[in-house]
Structures are given as structure tokens and as C-alpha cells.
């Protein structure tokens, strides 16, 4: 699945909005991961370097949780920086898919993420369900899931 020009534009604009301000990427990452814990079944069980069953406030103060957030943000940032270069985007998707296959994290997690990411984007950006941003994020996760199926 390739991303449309509208997807690319919406992804770029929304990532800039999500990560704006002091500690923007860190805060966006924390919000996304906490949202995933609440909205993707069994997601908390996938993390062993920190106690993912702590309260959200405790997680925000957990150094290992923050390290994982930084890893996730770096991977997302790499994908988003490459959306206008199809070859680089595919290479980044391949690398990310292989790392998740090695960790035995597959479509049972990324399928629900694809289905529900729109609600995170809508809430975080204050946009409606029919807006380009939620659609674009769903399409990005769909592209990842297609790559994950082949990994």
C-alpha cells in the first residue's frame, strides 16, 4: 500500500502538531504509548523492561518506560521523515517489521492499532473523524501491517 500525497501532507502536518513545544516528541510519545496501553488488547503484557501495569503517573516517572517511549518515537520519526521517499519508507517499514517479528509482536497488536489509531489522532489534534489526519495515520499503520505480513 502506498501513501497518497494527501496522506503524506497530513502525516507531516500532524506530526509537527503532535510534537510541537518543549519536550514535544517525548510528550507525544508518552501520550501515544499510554493510549495504546488503554486501547490495544494485551499491549501492556508486551513490555518486560518495566512494569507496564503501573499507573499512568508512575509510568511517566519510570526511566525504562521513557526509554521505550523514546525508541517508539524514534521509529515513528524515521517513518514520518521518509514518507516522501518511497524506497526509504519501505526500508524503514521492513526494518521495523523485522524487529517486531523478532519480538513476536505481530498483527494481533498492530491490527487493533490500525483500526483505532484514528481515535488517538482525532483526540490529540482536535479533528473530526473524516479529517485527513486520522485517515493518513490509519493508512501508515496499514502500510506497516502489509509489510509485517511479509516479514
UniProtKB/Swiss-Prot annotation:
Residues 2-151 form the Globin domain. Heme b binds at residue 100. Pfam families: Globin. It comes from the Eukaryota. SUPFAM superfamilies: Globin-like. Gene3D superfamilies: Globins. This molluscan globin lacks one of the heme-binding histidine residues found in most other globins. This is Globin.
